């Protein structure tokens, strides 16, 4: 029985160690919170075909843990890893008066975001940086947004109007958890800016050539039906010109498998030009019929001559009436169709798009 006291001491030590472990590893521990901010300095080389752009920005991080989150940082939408410049401002993170750590990164590189081009050329696009931690999930690390994030006041992007900055944080679930058991989520932050294409791109660059071609088509209604070659030739030339304009204006767009707003305007132009060609053919046939009736008048007897003259007057009246109505209604129908296409594509917000 001499060994009993030693046995009790060993058991007591084990109990104390177990209690210490329970205190050191509490269940449901809170994830580390890292404050992230961004200051967008420049956006350039926007490539619609590749859904890419070049961004220069300053990122800063504040945290209280021992691990440096900038070491495991990953840009989710990085396009060219070899061209990424990610330079820390300080060799070692600073220690702030409140005990938290601080590091700042100068970031420059080429990134991507899938552009929504359905309303081109009245579209708006997001230019963003997306970043997350590669080693710790949302149960271990959560990014918090710094409210002082923004863009440089003098930021200018040729061909675009700079709108509101983008500052977002969201949880992204990883399907399959990369082969691990359980659910895997990452805290992801987005920094960027919203760019709006101004109205002048459509109304001063693209629509004027289209309207000029349609106006040339409209002039055929002022030509007499006897000039059939000029009427039909003008319409066919206008149709070919519209085709070339569409190819030129949409050359920088990637293949989408669907039509954009500009394509719909061109499709309306094709319909109107085809209708004008149909009108020219109809008028030409009526004019030929009138010419035939006029040639037969001399050989007809008096009773038949009166009937033929009445028919001739009716045919000539139809020709003049058809041209007159076409002169009046074709411009109205085309302009109204363009307005409806633009309105249905952007809705009431089209009136708030900057010039």
Which residue stretches match the model-derived regions?
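N-terminal secretory signal peptides that target proteins for export/translocation
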Residues: 1-12
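Sec-dependent signal peptide recognition
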Residues: 12-18
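Intrinsically disordered, low-complexity peripheral segments of secretory-pathway and membrane proteins
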Residues: 29-69, 261-355
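Soluble non-transmembrane domains of integral membrane proteins
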Residues: 30-194
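Juxtamembrane amphipathic/hinge helix adjacent to a transmembrane helix
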Residues: 185-192, 243, 303-312
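Channel- or pocket-lining gating/hinge segments that regulate access to a cavity or pore
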Residues: 190-296, 314, 318-327
